[in-house]
Amino acid sequence: MTEKLVLAYSGGLDTSVAIPWLKEKGYDVIAVVLNVGQHGKDMVAIQEKALKVGASQSIVIDAQAEFADQYVAPVIKANMLYEGEYPMVSALSRPLIIKKLVDIAHENEAVAIAHGSTGHGNDQVRFEAAIHALDPDMKIEAPIRDFQWSREEEIEYAQQHDVPVPINLESPYSIDENLWGRANEAGILENPWHQAPEDAYALTTAIENTPDIPEFVDVTFTAGIPTALDGNEMPLADLIIKLNIMAGTHGIGRIDHIENRLVGIKSREIYEAPAAAVLMTAHKDLEDLTLERDVAHFKPMVEQQLANLVYEAKWVSPLFDSLMAFVDETQKNVNGVVKMKLFKGSAIAVARQSEHNSLYDEDLATYTSASSFDQAAAVGFIKLWTLSNTVYEQVNHVHSQKPSQLKLKN
């Protein structure tokens, strides 16, 4: 009896050539496509393509709502940006994809799961680390990596096996996309001195072609999660889709940077994340209004560690769960509205309010005669605040002269 295998299928070149290759190894291939918000993708066409190139089954799952609510929401609450820039576009969808693949593998009594990652990238680690965590006995196939195909060899193999080739050698972009953004690499983008051409972008307008009039949008947050735009409540997935269009029109969310991959190499990456740019900026601004100072100062350390964990394939880990428990606790009072200005590639918070959780007291902050701040209390506070440093300096004279030195000068 032929053994069954579940393939993470995207419709692209890598996973399309994987199907005939896996069949040649003796597998009955079940192709699984997860709709996590790929822009402009025809899921029916992708499903049919998998069958055409040799899959015995082709399954499409609409996971947009689950992706937004269970995976994007934690990233927003934790302000996760890998190396301060990358909002986890590709890294974020992998844990959900693997969860679904493992479930389908169990339902169909499949013995193996396959992915189309290369040996150069992070995804091979993300896919396989999650599979090992969820089912250590599951076999893993990675034909592109294991066969060490180059892009040219893949295309040649595809042509030999009647697999449609969606790209050409002159523009061999490798694109991954979901609700949260779009990642583009390979081809001419591999030269870090080469400016990315406009055809490398799809979600954002070039700055010179953006509107000359700014657009404003009010983003409402409830417990740290975006719940409404301009007062209109909507599911998070719909909110992200709408913001991607609004912010993308103004050229917001383009990221062109050198990234430290977890496999040890540096990579030039082009990302587009319009909604992420707006929501992350708005969320941080509301936190500035509602979080107590010590929490606000400590949380960024947790955020950085969480971003590293997600990037490094450790979404399924006790440390991730523990740190997210802290983040969830901090978000209970992150309720309010932030007014965002969208203009010429920038998303700027220009106003904010939190009816019940704002820690901003205008009576204390004002410099007018209406101030309720007790300035007389400052003298004693300053003496106590600096007492330990004052005593240390008097004893050790690290930054001041000793009394004996002063006498010599006189």
Curated annotation (Swiss-Prot):
An example Gene Ontology CC term for this record: cytoplasm
Entry's Gene Ontology BP terms: argininosuccinate metabolic process; L-arginine biosynthetic process; urea cycle
Keywords: Amino-acid biosynthesis, Arginine biosynthesis, ATP-binding, Cytoplasm, Ligase, Nucleotide-binding
Taxonomic source organism: Leuconostoc citreum (strain KM20)
Binding site for ATP: A8, Y9, S10, G11, G12, L13, D14, T15, S16, G116
Assembly, per entry: Homotetramer.
Family designation: Belongs to the argininosuccinate synthase family. Type 1 subfamily.
Residues holding L-citrulline: Y86, N122, R126, S174, E259, Y271
GO molecular function, one term: ATP binding
Matches recorded under Gene3D superfamilies: Argininosuccinate synthetase, chain A, domain 2 (3.90.1260.10), HUPs (3.40.50.620), Single helix bin (1.20.5.470)
UniProt-annotated binding residues for L-aspartate: T118, N122, D123
Matches recorded under Pfam families: Arginosuc_syn_C (PF20979), Arginosuc_synth (PF00764)
UniProt KW Nucleotide-binding keyword: yes
Pathway assigned in UniProt: Amino-acid biosynthesis; L-arginine biosynthesis; L-arginine from L-ornithine and carbamoyl phosphate: step 2/3
Name by which UniProt lists this protein: Argininosuccinate synthase
Location in or out of the cell: Cytoplasm
Domain of life: Bacteria
Catalytic activity field: L-citrulline + L-aspartate + ATP = 2-(N(omega)-L-arginino)succinate + AMP + diphosphate + H(+)
Listed InterPro entries: Arginosuc_syn_C, Arginosuc_syn_N, Arginosuc_synth, Arginosuc_synth_CS, Arginosuc_synth_type_1_subfam, AS_cat/multimer_dom_body, Rossmann-like_a/b/a_fold
Predominant place of localization: cytoplasm
